[in-house]
UniProtKB/Swiss-Prot annotation:
PANTHER family recorded: TYROSINE-PROTEIN PHOSPHATASE CORKSCREW
Organism the protein comes from: Styela plicata (Wrinkled sea squirt)
Catalytic activity: O-phospho-L-tyrosyl-[protein] + H2O = L-tyrosyl-[protein] + phosphate
Gene3D superfamilies: Protein tyrosine phosphatase superfamily (3.90.190.10)
Gene Ontology cellular component annotations, sorted alphabetically: cytoplasm
Record-annotated Tyrosine-protein phosphatase domain positions: 1-116
UniProt keyword list: Hydrolase, Protein phosphatase
The EC number(s) this enzyme carries: 3.1.3.48
Protein name, as recorded: Tyrosine-protein phosphatase 14
Xref: SMART domains: PTPc
Length: 116
């Protein structure tokens, strides 16, 4: 989360499943919807989730007790159907996902880099 705040990134893209074929592929780095979790000096709130067929969209709020206090909204786009060691069977799903990411990035005033 330090890198996210340092680079002032507001959009995160995740293209892996958490578990595939019974194997952990990614450690969940965010709390469940409506909950907060501390990551070192940062507190992350998972404020909202919207689940779609191929992806999940989340809105996080990251804060840090500092002088001045830090608070930032982060948009997390999680593509859930990209197979390990393969490519998605439906290119339309990938294109829709990319469109959503681009629209989100364009809608932000100073979005910083997209973190993938």
């Amino acid at each position: 989360w330090r890198m996210i705040t340092q680079e002032k990134a507001q959009v995160i893209v995740m293209t892996t499943k958490e578990v595939e074929r019974g194997r952990n592929k990614c450690i969940r780095y965010w709390p469940p919807e409506g909950e907060s979790k501390e990551y070192g000096a940062y507190t992350l709130l998972n404020a909202k989730e919207n689940d779609f067929r191929d992806y999940t969209w989340r809105q996080f709020v990251i804060t840090k007790e500092s002088d001045p206090p830090y608070k930032q909204i982060i948009y997390h786009h999680h593509f859930k159907v990209w197979p390990d060691h393969g490519v998605p069977s439906d290119p339309g799903g990938v294109l829709n996902f990319l469109h959503e990411i681009n629209e989100c990035q364009r809608s932000l005033k100073n979005p910083g880099p997209v973190i993938v």
